[in-house]
Protein backbone atom coordinates (compact mmCIF):
# COMPACT_ATOMS: atom_id res chain seq x y z
CA UNK A 1 0.00 0.00 0.00
CA UNK A 2 2.79 2.45 0.90
CA UNK A 3 4.10 2.35 -2.66
CA UNK A 4 1.06 4.32 -3.81
CA UNK A 5 1.85 7.54 -1.97
CA UNK A 6 4.73 9.64 -0.74
CA UNK A 7 4.48 11.80 2.38
CA UNK A 8 7.28 13.57 4.22
CA UNK A 9 5.62 13.10 7.62
CA UNK A 10 4.07 10.07 9.28
CA UNK A 11 0.27 10.11 9.20
CA UNK A 12 -1.89 8.81 12.03
CA UNK A 13 -5.52 7.76 12.06
CA UNK A 14 -6.10 10.13 14.99
CA UNK A 15 -3.48 12.88 15.02
CA UNK A 16 -4.10 14.06 18.59
CA UNK A 17 -4.60 10.67 20.23
CA UNK A 18 -1.91 8.63 21.96
CA UNK A 19 -1.52 5.11 20.62
CA UNK A 20 -3.12 5.92 17.27
CA UNK A 21 -2.64 3.53 14.37
CA UNK A 22 -0.42 4.60 11.49
CA UNK A 23 -2.38 5.70 8.44
CA UNK A 24 -1.17 4.51 5.03
CA UNK A 25 -3.70 5.87 2.52
CA UNK A 26 -3.67 5.50 -1.23
CA UNK A 27 -2.92 8.41 -3.53
CA UNK A 28 -5.99 10.25 -4.94
CA UNK A 29 -6.23 8.35 -8.25
CA UNK A 30 -6.18 4.76 -6.92
CA UNK A 31 -8.29 5.91 -3.98
CA UNK A 32 -11.15 7.06 -6.20
CA UNK A 33 -10.93 3.90 -8.33
CA UNK A 34 -11.05 1.63 -5.27
CA UNK A 35 -14.04 3.49 -3.82
CA UNK A 36 -15.82 3.00 -7.15
CA UNK A 37 -14.94 -0.71 -7.39
CA UNK A 38 -15.74 -1.55 -3.77
CA UNK A 39 -18.81 0.68 -3.74
CA UNK A 40 -20.16 -0.94 -6.90
CA UNK A 41 -19.77 -4.36 -5.27
CA UNK A 42 -21.70 -3.24 -2.20
CA UNK A 43 -24.51 -1.68 -4.25
CA UNK A 44 -24.75 -4.77 -6.46
CA UNK A 45 -24.86 -7.07 -3.42
CA UNK A 46 -27.63 -5.01 -1.81
CA UNK A 47 -29.81 -4.34 -4.86
CA UNK A 48 -29.29 -7.68 -6.60
CA UNK A 49 -30.02 -9.83 -3.56
CA UNK A 50 -32.96 -7.64 -2.58
CA UNK A 51 -34.48 -8.35 -6.00
CA UNK A 52 -34.01 -12.09 -5.40
CA UNK A 53 -35.73 -11.93 -2.01
CA UNK A 54 -38.64 -9.84 -3.33
CA UNK A 55 -39.07 -12.17 -6.32
CA UNK A 56 -39.29 -15.32 -4.23
CA UNK A 57 -41.53 -13.84 -1.54
CA UNK A 58 -43.91 -11.99 -3.87
CA UNK A 59 -44.54 -14.43 -6.71
CA UNK A 60 -46.51 -17.47 -5.54
CA UNK A 61 -45.12 -19.59 -8.36
CA UNK A 62 -41.72 -19.33 -6.69
CA UNK A 63 -42.94 -20.49 -3.28
CA UNK A 64 -41.03 -23.77 -3.06
CA UNK A 65 -38.64 -25.25 -0.48
CA UNK A 66 -35.68 -24.82 -2.84
CA UNK A 67 -36.49 -21.19 -3.60
CA UNK A 68 -36.96 -20.39 0.09
CA UNK A 69 -33.37 -21.58 0.57
CA UNK A 70 -32.26 -19.33 -2.28
CA UNK A 71 -34.12 -16.37 -0.75
CA UNK A 72 -32.47 -17.02 2.61
CA UNK A 73 -29.06 -17.21 0.91
CA UNK A 74 -29.82 -13.90 -0.80
CA UNK A 75 -30.74 -12.43 2.60
CA UNK A 76 -27.32 -13.38 3.97
CA UNK A 77 -25.58 -11.84 0.95
CA UNK A 78 -27.81 -8.76 1.23
CA UNK A 79 -26.69 -8.30 4.85
CA UNK A 80 -23.05 -8.63 3.80
CA UNK A 81 -23.62 -5.88 1.25
CA UNK A 82 -25.42 -3.47 3.56
CA UNK A 83 -23.78 -4.05 6.96
CA UNK A 84 -20.27 -5.30 6.18
CA UNK A 85 -18.95 -4.11 2.81
CA UNK A 86 -19.45 -0.31 3.22
CA UNK A 87 -17.47 -0.18 6.49
CA UNK A 88 -14.84 -2.62 5.24
CA UNK A 89 -14.49 -0.38 2.18
CA UNK A 90 -13.55 2.61 4.33
CA UNK A 91 -11.16 0.52 6.44
CA UNK A 92 -9.48 -0.99 3.38
CA UNK A 93 -8.97 2.30 1.53
CA UNK A 94 -8.30 4.68 4.43
CA UNK A 95 -6.34 2.03 6.40
CA UNK A 96 -8.13 3.21 9.54
CA UNK A 97 -11.26 2.25 11.47
CA UNK A 98 -13.32 5.31 12.38
CA UNK A 99 -16.41 3.62 13.81
CA UNK A 100 -15.35 2.73 17.36
CA UNK A 101 -14.29 -0.47 19.14
CA UNK A 102 -17.82 -1.67 19.94
CA UNK A 103 -18.90 -1.46 16.32
CA UNK A 104 -15.62 -3.09 15.26
CA UNK A 105 -16.59 -6.21 17.23
CA UNK A 106 -20.16 -6.14 15.88
CA UNK A 107 -18.95 -5.59 12.32
CA UNK A 108 -16.45 -8.46 12.56
CA UNK A 109 -19.09 -10.72 14.10
CA UNK A 110 -21.56 -9.95 11.30
CA UNK A 111 -18.83 -10.38 8.70
CA UNK A 112 -18.01 -13.91 9.80
CA UNK A 113 -21.61 -14.93 10.57
CA UNK A 114 -23.15 -13.82 7.28
CA UNK A 115 -20.32 -15.19 5.14
CA UNK A 116 -20.36 -18.62 6.78
CA UNK A 117 -24.14 -18.57 6.60
CA UNK A 118 -23.78 -18.30 2.81
CA UNK A 119 -21.55 -21.38 2.81
CA UNK A 120 -24.06 -23.46 4.78
CA UNK A 121 -26.94 -22.30 2.59
CA UNK A 122 -25.06 -23.42 -0.51
CA UNK A 123 -24.34 -26.77 1.12
CA UNK A 124 -28.03 -27.37 1.86
CA UNK A 125 -28.97 -26.20 -1.64
CA UNK A 126 -26.59 -28.86 -2.96
CA UNK A 127 -28.42 -31.48 -0.91
CA UNK A 128 -31.74 -30.21 -2.26
CA UNK A 129 -30.55 -30.40 -5.88
CA UNK A 130 -29.05 -33.86 -5.30
CA UNK A 131 -32.39 -35.25 -4.12
CA UNK A 132 -34.31 -33.43 -6.88
CA UNK A 133 -32.14 -34.83 -9.67
CA UNK A 134 -31.39 -38.33 -8.36
CA UNK A 135 -34.82 -39.15 -6.89
CA UNK A 136 -37.36 -36.76 -8.46
CA UNK A 137 -40.42 -38.89 -7.68
CA UNK A 138 -39.95 -38.74 -3.90
CA UNK A 139 -38.32 -35.29 -3.85
CA UNK A 140 -41.58 -33.42 -3.02
CA UNK A 141 -42.09 -35.63 0.04
CA UNK A 142 -38.46 -35.59 1.17
CA UNK A 143 -37.57 -31.91 0.85
CA UNK A 144 -40.65 -30.17 2.21
CA UNK A 145 -41.13 -26.61 3.41
CA UNK A 146 -40.52 -27.73 7.00
CA UNK A 147 -37.25 -29.43 6.01
CA UNK A 148 -36.25 -26.28 4.16
CA UNK A 149 -37.05 -24.28 7.29
CA UNK A 150 -34.81 -26.51 9.39
CA UNK A 151 -31.96 -26.08 6.90
CA UNK A 152 -32.44 -22.31 6.92
CA UNK A 153 -32.45 -22.22 10.73
CA UNK A 154 -29.22 -24.22 10.94
CA UNK A 155 -27.63 -21.99 8.30
CA UNK A 156 -28.26 -18.95 10.48
CA UNK A 157 -27.93 -20.24 14.04
CA UNK A 158 -24.59 -22.06 13.74
CA UNK A 159 -22.67 -19.15 12.15
CA UNK A 160 -24.16 -16.67 14.64
CA UNK A 161 -23.17 -18.85 17.60
CA UNK A 162 -19.68 -19.41 16.19
CA UNK A 163 -19.00 -15.74 15.40
CA UNK A 164 -20.36 -14.61 18.77
CA UNK A 165 -18.02 -17.05 20.51
CA UNK A 166 -15.05 -15.76 18.50
CA UNK A 167 -15.61 -12.04 19.02
CA UNK A 168 -17.39 -11.74 22.36
CA UNK A 169 -15.90 -14.41 24.66
CA UNK A 170 -12.18 -13.83 24.14
CA UNK A 171 -11.42 -17.54 23.83
CA UNK A 172 -10.13 -17.11 20.27
CA UNK A 173 -7.27 -14.90 21.55
CA UNK A 174 -5.98 -17.33 24.19
CA UNK A 175 -2.26 -17.93 23.81
CA UNK A 176 -1.67 -14.91 21.58
CA UNK A 177 -2.39 -12.13 24.07
CA UNK A 178 1.00 -10.50 23.46
CA UNK A 179 0.38 -10.40 19.71
CA UNK A 180 -3.08 -8.93 20.16
CA UNK A 181 -1.65 -6.30 22.51
CA UNK A 182 1.14 -5.42 20.06
CA UNK A 183 -1.33 -4.97 17.19
CA UNK A 184 -3.82 -2.99 19.26
CA UNK A 185 -4.00 0.71 18.45
CA UNK A 186 -6.62 3.45 18.22
CA UNK A 187 -8.20 3.42 14.79
CA UNK A 188 -7.57 -0.24 14.08
CA UNK A 189 -9.99 -3.13 13.63
CA UNK A 190 -7.82 -6.14 12.93
CA UNK A 191 -9.14 -9.61 13.68
CA UNK A 192 -6.49 -11.91 15.16
CA UNK A 193 -7.38 -15.41 16.38
CA UNK A 194 -5.24 -18.30 17.58
CA UNK A 195 -4.37 -21.34 15.50
CA UNK A 196 -7.11 -23.52 16.97
CA UNK A 197 -9.84 -21.14 15.85
CA UNK A 198 -8.20 -20.63 12.48
CA UNK A 199 -8.41 -24.39 11.96
CA UNK A 200 -12.07 -24.35 12.99
CA UNK A 201 -12.71 -21.54 10.51
CA UNK A 202 -10.93 -23.49 7.80
CA UNK A 203 -13.05 -26.57 8.52
CA UNK A 204 -16.22 -24.45 8.36
CA UNK A 205 -15.22 -23.63 4.80
CA UNK A 206 -13.62 -26.95 3.86
CA UNK A 207 -16.32 -29.39 5.01
CA UNK A 208 -19.27 -27.72 3.22
CA UNK A 209 -17.07 -27.30 0.14
CA UNK A 210 -16.19 -31.00 0.05
CA UNK A 211 -19.86 -31.92 0.51
CA UNK A 212 -20.82 -29.63 -2.37
CA UNK A 213 -18.13 -31.03 -4.67
CA UNK A 214 -19.17 -34.64 -3.97
CA UNK A 215 -22.89 -33.97 -4.40
CA UNK A 216 -22.54 -31.94 -7.58
CA UNK A 217 -20.22 -34.54 -9.07
CA UNK A 218 -22.94 -37.14 -8.50
CA UNK A 219 -25.64 -34.76 -9.73
CA UNK A 220 -23.99 -34.19 -13.09
CA UNK A 221 -23.31 -37.91 -13.57
CA UNK A 222 -26.96 -38.76 -12.89
CA UNK A 223 -28.21 -35.83 -14.99
CA UNK A 224 -26.12 -37.00 -17.92
CA UNK A 225 -27.52 -40.52 -17.63
CA UNK A 226 -31.08 -39.18 -17.41
CA UNK A 227 -30.58 -37.04 -20.51
CA UNK A 228 -29.48 -40.08 -22.51
CA UNK A 229 -32.41 -42.19 -21.24
CA UNK A 230 -35.00 -39.51 -22.03
CA UNK A 231 -33.58 -38.91 -25.49
CA UNK A 232 -33.69 -42.64 -26.21
CA UNK A 233 -37.22 -42.96 -24.79
CA UNK A 234 -38.59 -40.04 -26.81
CA UNK A 235 -37.05 -41.26 -30.07
CA UNK A 236 -38.27 -44.82 -29.50
CA UNK A 237 -41.84 -44.06 -28.38
CA UNK A 238 -43.42 -41.66 -30.85
CA UNK A 239 -46.89 -42.71 -29.73
CA UNK A 240 -46.27 -41.27 -26.28
CA UNK A 241 -44.44 -38.22 -27.48
CA UNK A 242 -46.58 -35.75 -25.52
CA UNK A 243 -46.06 -37.49 -22.17
CA UNK A 244 -42.41 -38.16 -22.79
CA UNK A 245 -41.91 -34.62 -24.03
CA UNK A 246 -43.31 -33.34 -20.73
CA UNK A 247 -40.93 -35.58 -18.79
CA UNK A 248 -38.07 -34.35 -20.92
CA UNK A 249 -38.95 -30.73 -20.16
CA UNK A 250 -39.18 -31.40 -16.44
CA UNK A 251 -35.87 -33.26 -16.41
CA UNK A 252 -34.25 -30.51 -18.46
CA UNK A 253 -35.50 -27.87 -16.02
CA UNK A 254 -34.12 -29.79 -13.03
CA UNK A 255 -30.76 -30.24 -14.77
CA UNK A 256 -30.63 -26.55 -15.63
CA UNK A 257 -31.41 -25.62 -12.03
CA UNK A 258 -28.64 -27.93 -10.84
CA UNK A 259 -26.25 -26.45 -13.41
CA UNK A 260 -27.06 -22.89 -12.36
CA UNK A 261 -26.59 -23.63 -8.68
CA UNK A 262 -23.44 -25.57 -9.57
CA UNK A 263 -22.05 -22.39 -11.12
CA UNK A 264 -23.00 -20.58 -7.91
CA UNK A 265 -21.03 -23.12 -5.86
CA UNK A 266 -17.99 -22.83 -8.14
CA UNK A 267 -18.14 -19.02 -7.86
CA UNK A 268 -18.26 -19.36 -4.08
CA UNK A 269 -15.23 -21.65 -3.96
CA UNK A 270 -13.17 -19.50 -6.34
CA UNK A 271 -14.04 -16.36 -4.37
CA UNK A 272 -13.37 -17.76 -0.93
CA UNK A 273 -10.44 -20.12 -1.48
CA UNK A 274 -7.72 -17.39 -1.63
CA UNK A 275 -8.89 -15.80 1.63
CA UNK A 276 -9.25 -19.14 3.42
CA UNK A 277 -5.77 -20.30 2.41
CA UNK A 278 -4.26 -16.93 3.29
CA UNK A 279 -5.85 -16.95 6.76
CA UNK A 280 -4.57 -20.49 7.39
CA UNK A 281 -1.03 -19.71 6.22
CA UNK A 282 -0.89 -16.44 8.17
CA UNK A 283 -1.86 -18.12 11.43
CA UNK A 284 1.04 -20.58 11.21
CA UNK A 285 3.61 -18.31 9.53
CA UNK A 286 3.37 -15.24 11.72
CA UNK A 287 1.04 -13.06 9.63
CA UNK A 288 3.46 -12.56 6.75
CA UNK A 289 0.90 -11.62 4.09
CA UNK A 290 1.38 -8.09 2.69
CA UNK A 291 -1.56 -5.77 3.36
CA UNK A 292 -2.49 -5.39 -0.31
CA UNK A 293 -2.58 -9.18 -0.82
CA UNK A 294 -4.83 -9.57 2.20
CA UNK A 295 -7.18 -6.89 0.87
CA UNK A 296 -7.39 -8.61 -2.53
CA UNK A 297 -8.27 -11.92 -0.87
CA UNK A 298 -10.77 -10.26 1.44
CA UNK A 299 -12.62 -8.38 -1.30
CA UNK A 300 -12.60 -11.41 -3.55
CA UNK A 301 -14.64 -13.11 -0.82
CA UNK A 302 -16.91 -10.09 -0.33
CA UNK A 303 -17.63 -9.85 -4.04
CA UNK A 304 -19.10 -13.35 -3.95
CA UNK A 305 -22.16 -11.82 -2.28
CA UNK A 306 -22.69 -9.73 -5.42
CA UNK A 307 -22.18 -12.59 -7.88
CA UNK A 308 -25.20 -14.78 -7.21
CA UNK A 309 -27.88 -12.37 -8.54
CA UNK A 310 -25.82 -11.97 -11.73
CA UNK A 311 -25.68 -15.76 -12.10
CA UNK A 312 -29.45 -16.06 -11.59
CA UNK A 313 -30.10 -13.28 -14.10
CA UNK A 314 -27.89 -14.99 -16.68
CA UNK A 315 -29.31 -18.51 -16.30
CA UNK A 316 -32.90 -18.03 -15.06
CA UNK A 317 -35.45 -16.48 -17.49
CA UNK A 318 -37.98 -16.35 -14.64
CA UNK A 319 -35.65 -14.13 -12.61
CA UNK A 320 -35.18 -11.74 -15.53
CA UNK A 321 -38.97 -11.57 -15.93
CA UNK A 322 -39.42 -10.98 -12.20
CA UNK A 323 -36.86 -8.14 -12.29
CA UNK A 324 -38.76 -6.44 -15.12
CA UNK A 325 -42.03 -6.69 -13.19
CA UNK A 326 -40.43 -5.34 -10.01
CA UNK A 327 -38.55 -2.45 -11.60
CA UNK A 328 -41.53 -1.44 -13.73
CA UNK A 329 -43.76 -1.31 -10.66
CA UNK A 330 -46.16 -3.91 -12.06
CA UNK A 331 -45.89 -5.99 -8.89
CA UNK A 332 -47.98 -3.27 -7.22
CA UNK A 333 -50.96 -4.23 -9.36
CA UNK A 334 -53.59 -6.63 -8.10
CA UNK A 335 -53.01 -10.34 -8.68
CA UNK A 336 -49.41 -9.71 -9.81
CA UNK A 337 -48.31 -12.38 -7.35
CA UNK A 338 -50.00 -15.02 -9.53
CA UNK A 339 -48.08 -14.04 -12.68
CA UNK A 340 -46.76 -17.00 -14.65
CA UNK A 341 -42.99 -16.49 -14.68
CA UNK A 342 -42.24 -19.71 -16.54
CA UNK A 343 -44.24 -18.96 -19.68
CA UNK A 344 -42.18 -18.60 -22.82
Swiss-Prot record:
InterPro entries: GPCR_Rhodpsn, GPCR_Rhodpsn_7TM, TAAR, TAAR_fam. Specifically expressed in neurons of the olfactory epithelium. Its main location: membrane. Residues 53-67, 133-146, 217-260, 304-344 are cytoplasmic. Disulfide bonds join 21-185, 104-189. One of its GO terms (molecular function) is trace-amine receptor activity. It is a multi-pass membrane protein. One of its GO terms (cellular component) is plasma membrane. It is found in: Cell membrane. The chain crosses the membrane at residues 32-52, 68-88, 112-132, 147-167, 196-216, 261-281, 283-303. Changing residue 302 to A: Abolished trace-amine receptor activity. It comes from the Eukaryota. Pfam families: 7tm_1. Disruption phenotype: Mice lacking Taar2, Taar3, Taar4, Taar5, Taar6, Taar7a, Taar7b, Taar7d, Taar7e, Taar7f, Taar8a, Taar8b, Taar8c and Taar9 show no visible phenotype or behavioral deficits. They however show an absence of aversion to low concentrations of amines such as 2-phenylethylamine, isopentylamine, N-methylpiperidine and cadaverine. SUPFAM superfamilies: Family A G protein-coupled receptor-like. Keywords: Cell membrane, Disulfide bond, G-protein coupled receptor, Glycoprotein, Membrane, Receptor, Transducer, Transmembrane, Transmembrane helix. Glycans are attached at residues 4, 18. Residues 1-31, 89-111, 168-195, 282 are extracellular. In addition to the well known disulfide bond common to G-protein coupled receptor 1 family, trace amine-associated receptors (TAARs) contain an unique disulfide bond (Cys-21-Cys-185) connecting the N-terminus to the extracellular Loop 2 (ECL2), which is required for agonist-induced receptor activation. Olfactory receptor specific for trace amines, such ascyclohexylamine (1-MPD). Trace amine compounds are enriched in animal body fluids and act on trace amine-associated receptors (TAARs) to elicit both intraspecific and interspecific innate behaviors. Ligand-binding causes a conformation change that triggers signaling via G(s)-class of G alpha proteins (GNAL or GNAS). Belongs to the G-protein coupled receptor 1 family. This is Trace amine-associated receptor 8c. It comes from Mus musculus.
